[in-house]
C-alpha cells in the first residue's frame, strides 16, 4: 500500500465521482486535501480566500491558482477584507465561512482536532467542545496525522506555502501546538494526540446517546416551557436543555453555547431564585408567570 492509499484508507471522503468544494489556502494541509481528493476520484472545485492581511496574500492566491491550473481543477478566488483589531482570528474565520459554500471540505487533521479540544478545555467547554470534528463530513482528514499528510505532499511535484503566522506565539493555538502538546507528550511519556482523539470519539458516542435520551426535550421551546415542570428536572438535563436554547452567534463565527456561568444563572431564573439575568450576545433571560422570555 503506497502513501496515498494508506491516507485514503484513513480518510472520510465521499464516493468517487462526487462533486465537492475544497478550501485551499496553499498550505501543506489544504494542498494534501486537494491531492487526496483528486486521488479519490472526486469532482473537485477549489476555493481560496484572500484576506489581504499580509502583503504577500495575493501572491498566495496566484500560487494556488497556478497549481489548480496544472491539475485542471476549477479555481474560485474570494476577496474579503477583515479590519485589524482584536479577535482577528475569529473574525477572519467568520469571513472565510461566509465567503465559501457551507459544505466546503477543509484540511483539518487529527492534530487540529486535538488542538481544538485543548483550546476548548481552557474555555471550560462541555461535551460539544470536547468532541469537535468527530464525524464531521467537512473534515475528511480528521483521522490523519499532520506529519503524515505533510510527508505525502513533500513527495508531490507541488510546493506548499507556509504561513509565517503559524509560528507566532501570540496566537493561542500556536502556543498549544508548539508548547502545550509537546509538554503533555513529555509528561505522559507517549504521543497524546491519538489518545485525546480517541477520547473525543468515545465522548461523541456518549453525547449521541444522551441526545437520544433527551430527544423529546428538543421539541420543547424556551417560551412554551413551564418553569414548574423544568424545576423538577435533574440539573444535568436542565443545563443541557438551556445550553441549546441559549446558544448565540459570536461575531458571525458560528453559533456558540452559553458559558457555564451563564447556564447556572439561567438555572436560577428557571427555579425562581432570580427574576432575570443578562446573557451573551446582548440577550436577557427573564421569568414571569412561570414562563421564560429571551430578549
Where is each model-derived feature located?
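Enrichment for repetitive, rod-forming helical segments
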Residues: 100-103, 184, 214, 294
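Core alpha/beta nucleotide-donor-binding catalytic domains of modification enzymes
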Residues: 1-179
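AMP-forming adenylation/ATP pyrophosphatase catalytic core
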Residues: 2-29, 48-51, 80-82, 178, ...
Amino acid at each position: 500500500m503506497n502513501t496515498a492509499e494508506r491516507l485514503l484508507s484513513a480518510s472520510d471522503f465521499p464516493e468517487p465521482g462526487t462533486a465537492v468544494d475544497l478550501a485551499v489556502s496553499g498550505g501543506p494541509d489544504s494542498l494534501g486535501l486537494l491531492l487526496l481528493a483528486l486521488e479519490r476520484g472526486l469532482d473537485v472545485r477549489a476555493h481560496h480566500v484572500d484576506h489581504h492581511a499580509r502583503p504577500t496574500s495575493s501572491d498566495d492566491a496566484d500560487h494556488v491558482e497556478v497549481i489548480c491550473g496544472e491539475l485542471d481543477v476549477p479555481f474560485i478566488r474570494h476577496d474579503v477584507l477583515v479590519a485589524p483589531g482584536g479577535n482577528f482570528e475569529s473574525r477572519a474565520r467568520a469571513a472565510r465561512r461566509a465567503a465559501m459554500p457551507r459544505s466546503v471540505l477543509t484540511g483539518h487533521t487529527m492534530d487540529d482536532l486535538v488542538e481544538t479540544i485543548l483550546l476548548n478545555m481552557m474555555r471550560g467547554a462541555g461535551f460539544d467542545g470536547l468532541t469537535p470534528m468527530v464525524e464531521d463530513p467537512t473534515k475528511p482528514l480528521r483521522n490523519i496525522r499532520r506529519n503524515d499528510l505533510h510527508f505525502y505532499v513533500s513527495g508531490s511535484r507541488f510546493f506548499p506555502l507556509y504561513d509565517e503566522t503559524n509560528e507566532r506565539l501570540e496566537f493561542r493555538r500556536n502556543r498549544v501546538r508548539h508548547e502545550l502538546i509537546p509538554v503533555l507528550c513529555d509528561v505522559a511519556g507517549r504521543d497524546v494526540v491519538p489518545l485525546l482523539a480517541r477520547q473525543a470519539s468515545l465522548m461523541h458516542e456518549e453525547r449521541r446517546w444522551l441526545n437520544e435520551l433527551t430527544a423529546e426535550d428538543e421539541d420543547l421551546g424556551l417560551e412554551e416551557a413551564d418553569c414548574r415542570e423544568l424545576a423538577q428536572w435533574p440539573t444535568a438535563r436542565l443545563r443541557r436543555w438551556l445550553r441549546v436554547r441559549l446558544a448565540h452567534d459570536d461575531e458571525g463565527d458560528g453559533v456558540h453555547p452559553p458559558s457555564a456561568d451563564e447556564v447556572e444563572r439561567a438555572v436560577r431564573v428557571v427555579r425562581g431564585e432570580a427574576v432575570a439575568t443578562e446573557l451573551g450576545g446582548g440577550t436577557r433571560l427573564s421569568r414571569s408567570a412561570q414562563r421564560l422570555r429571551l430578549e
